[in-house]
């Protein structure tokens, strides 16, 4: 039965390619496509889960802003000062969004939620990376789009976001910080509602969705993950500004398919790290990326990222367990 389901999923993923430029990595596929257009074109109830890290400034991944980032001119990207001889990576200025841009962000995620709702099977989960500044806005908008808010996954990680002294007045106010140093990353866990009268067990039988997969040791998936920052070797493989570590993504991708069957989708696949995580643990995935530079980067990066051994694969070294 499981082999038949896997074979059916592999056939289904072929039909999701449509007429888009694409490449394959193992059993997974990445398309050069705009996710709004693509998700609107594919049949309803096509994918089992979504794991993604979307562009929160909306405009920070516009082509002109990416060019400014590459040239070191900033734009929406804040180019932090170096310290201890180390250069800090550019970060998008979420606090730079004015009311009009926040309204644009709201429309963006409302429309995105609607096409995601269309693409997901009933009971399909969405794992969506966010940040403390905008998560309350984005999660609320996704609820308006029709998705259920289930809970929040908290990734404990020490970042370089926040904690800065007042800009251009660092010497005048040396004992002040504009914001707390960020030490966690919120991920929204949402779900497409089950059909009326359907129980979780019914949904699992009919759609292979509705629940979360337990950890390999049999324990339940937890809503806190102690994480590392993305290691240097992974960043060398995939120079993407919001690259998440494989040790984190593999845990999330594992949880997203309760029976270990189905198709994971990353609509903002960037360097392909979610697809790489899916390949590493042996599940099917499909990613879409509209920026040709990142699309081509993922062609090179995904096989390398998928082949990495992380702490979660080493016996006795599950470094990010709550136990």
Residue locations for each model-derived region?
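Core catalytic lobe of class I
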Residues: 1-308, 312, 320-323
């Amino acid at each position: 039965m499981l082999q038949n389901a896997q074979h059916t999923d592999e056939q289904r993923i072929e039909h999701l390619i449509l007429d888009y430029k694409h490449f394959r990595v193992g059993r997974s596929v990445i398309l050069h496509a705009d996710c709004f257009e693509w998700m609107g074109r594919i049949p309803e109830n096509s994918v089992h889960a979504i794991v993604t890290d979307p562009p929160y400034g909306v405009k920070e991944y516009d082509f002109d802003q990416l060019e400014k980032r590459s040239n070191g001119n900033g734009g929406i990207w804040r180019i932090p000062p170096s310290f201890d001889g180390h250069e800090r990576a550019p970060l998008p200025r979420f606090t730079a969004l004015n009311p009009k841009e926040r309204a644009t962000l709201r429309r963006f995620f409302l429309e995105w939620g609607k096409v995601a709702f269309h693409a997901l099977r009933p009971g399909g989960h969405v794992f969506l990376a966010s940040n403390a500044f905008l998560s309350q806005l984005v999660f609320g908008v996704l609820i308006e789009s029709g998705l259920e808010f289930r809970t929040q996954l908290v990734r404990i990680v020490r970042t370089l976001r926040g904690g800065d002294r007042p800009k251009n007045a660092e010497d005048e106010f040396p004992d002040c910080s504009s914001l707390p140093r960020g030490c966690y990353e919120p991920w929204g866990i949402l779900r497409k509602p089950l059909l009326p009268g359907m129980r979780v067990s019914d949904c699992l039988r009919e759609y292979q969705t509705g629940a979360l997969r337990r950890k390999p040791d049999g324990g339940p998936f937890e809503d806190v993950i102690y994480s590392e920052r993305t290691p240097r070797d992974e960043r060398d493989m995939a120079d993407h500004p919001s690259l998440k570590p494989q040790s984190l993504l593999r845990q999330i991708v594992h949880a997203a398919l309760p029976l270990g069957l189905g198709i994971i989708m990353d609509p903002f696949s960037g360097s392909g790290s979610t697809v790489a995580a899916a390949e590493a643990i042996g599940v099917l995935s499909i990613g879409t990326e509209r920026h040709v530079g990142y699309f081509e980067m993922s062609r090179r990066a995904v096989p390398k990222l998928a082949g990495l051994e992380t702490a979660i694969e080493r016996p006795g070294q599950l470094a990010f367990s709550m136990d």
